[in-house]
């Protein structure tokens, strides 16, 4: 089903970038920058805080961007993003079908990025804060407190169902 595929792709993109829903919905080509080594970055002010995020685009996220590069419904934006309410409703549907008993939401992806992608792999608290657009590490420390290997196991279940 096309809508389920799009919701999955946006969710996975957020897991690999840490972008909040409002920021991924607003993501446009102007936010993509190549550095002097040819590496792709997302450079964008967070909608919520207006703080600049600098996020390296990992291969999984890059492949999702490539997939939607010429999709008509993305005109002016990089991804086909439904409303937050619809996204969360579809994520609940996906979780039910996959037998996931965790409440999946667009914000779950941001937490997964901070914990399973970054902190669990040794990225410093300061760098995670910068990528998430936090003013300092006090908010980021909240993510570290919820670091739990069960998040990774749950995401593996999602991946095997999608």
What is the predicted role of each segment?
Residues 71-73, 158-162:
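C-terminal secondary-structure termini that scaffold catalytic or DNA-interacting sites
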Residues 1-21:
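Basic, Lys/Arg- and aromatic-enriched nucleic-acid-binding interface segment
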Residues 1-7, 70-77, 81, 89-130:
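Short, basic (Lys/Arg/His-rich) helix/loop patches that form interaction surfaces
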Residues 17, 26-66:
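Conserved tyrosine-mediated DNA breakage-rejoining catalytic core shared by Y-recombinases
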């Amino acid at each position: 089903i096309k809508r389920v595929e799009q919701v999955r792709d946006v969710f996975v993109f957020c897991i690999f970038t840490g972008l909040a829903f409002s920021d991924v919905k607003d993501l446009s080509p102007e936010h993509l920058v190549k550095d002097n080594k040819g590496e792709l970055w997302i450079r964008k002010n967070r909608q919520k805080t207006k703080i600049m995020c600098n996020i390296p685009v990992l291969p999984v996220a890059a492949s999702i961007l490539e997939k939607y590069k010429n999709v008509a419904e993305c005109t002016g934006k990089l991804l086909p993003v439904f409303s937050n309410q619809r996204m969360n409703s579809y994520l609940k549907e996906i979780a039910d079908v996959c037998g996931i008993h965790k409440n999946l939401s667009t914000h779950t992806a941001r937490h997964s990025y901070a914990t399973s992608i970054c902190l669990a792999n040794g990225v410093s608290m300061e760098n995670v804060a910068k990528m998430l657009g936090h003013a300092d590490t006090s908010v980021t420390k909240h993510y570290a407190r919820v670091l739990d290997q069960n998040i990774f196991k749950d995401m593996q279940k999602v991946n095997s169902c999608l």
